[in-house]
């Protein structure tokens, strides 16, 4: 029997990516598509690549429209998911691709988002220690942010194996789709092409507390994070370069062994052969993650680099993967697409 899925926020990048993946899922029937500001328009006018759904008309996001579905994907701006979710029954699997339910500490939410904390849901990054167990049978899932996905997968093996001191320095470049679909002057082609620029510098980026939360859980102690995001002249993808001071006695061999153990059975995370480095082009449009790690003996630092597609593994692919686990379906179902090259 097909799993009936609704997507709220179908006109945006995250909602569109979710639909692209859901179309390839053999157990899914796509139900209601909503988009408040675009209600009444055909999806094809807003997401012309979704040809099988082009004639579907967007509806307003309301409990009546979303009723009668097994799963509801929420692709809404932060602060809007909670109001919709509380109107959906406890038997509906709600997968929130926004930020509302990711953080455990209410003070972190209020500091970085400036509104009351809505609560915390099981976290949709199965590769983290205990991640799959938290998702199995769950009816509520908080999909991680794109940067925290890339950073957490790059660094958690070092912290879980007690190889790194509890402080990390991260510089990550992201494609422009990470900023959403709304028109913004700094995202105009003439502003972005041929240029890279940092933003959210000095610990103010909203994904910072999520990284601290994940790495601290892996380490078993608080981890400080210095995070500098950079806007790259590409539509999608994240390349995260993460460094942490190594503990005494660490060797290149012990670092490599920790990463091999962490990712040995992971279907989507690929620890590359030594000497090969992650590239966003290699994971474009896929749920794959490329990871490489090195040990700088002179500086006594562990360097871990990851590449993801921010819209796929970083958002909608991670959502679909988590949905599969929650429903007891094979984890890779609907996610067999590999990267596009060149």
Curated annotation (Swiss-Prot):
**Known InterPro entries for this protein?**
AGPR_AS (IPR023013), AGPR_type-1 (IPR000706), NAD(P)-bd_dom_sf (IPR036291), NAGSA_dehydrogenase (IPR050085), Semialdehyde_DH_NAD-bd (IPR000534)
Kindly identify the residues recorded as the active site: 146
Catalysis performed (reactions): N-acetyl-L-glutamate 5-semialdehyde + phosphate + NADP(+) = N-acetyl-L-glutamyl 5-phosphate + NADPH + H(+)
Q: What pathway, per the record?
A: Amino-acid biosynthesis; L-arginine biosynthesis; N(2)-acetyl-L-ornithine from L-glutamate: step 3/4
Subcellular compartments: Cytoplasm
Known EC number: 1.2.1.38
PANTHER family attached here?
A: N-ACETYL-GAMMA-GLUTAMYL-PHOSPHATE REDUCTASE, CHLOROPLASTIC-RELATED (PTHR32338:SF10), N-ACETYL-GAMMA-GLUTAMYL-PHOSPHATE REDUCTASE, CHLOROPLASTIC-RELATED-RELATED (PTHR32338)
Family label: Belongs to the NAGSA dehydrogenase family. Type 1 subfamily.
What this chain does, per the entry, is described as: Catalyzes the NADPH-dependent reduction of N-acetyl-5-glutamyl phosphate to yield N-acetyl-L-glutamate 5-semialdehyde.
User: Can you say what this protein is called?
Assistant: N-acetyl-gamma-glutamyl-phosphate reductase
According to its UniProt entry, this protein's organism is Streptomyces avermitilis (strain ATCC 31267 / DSM 46492 / JCM 5070 / NBRC 14893 / NCIMB 12804 / NRRL 8165 / MA-4680)
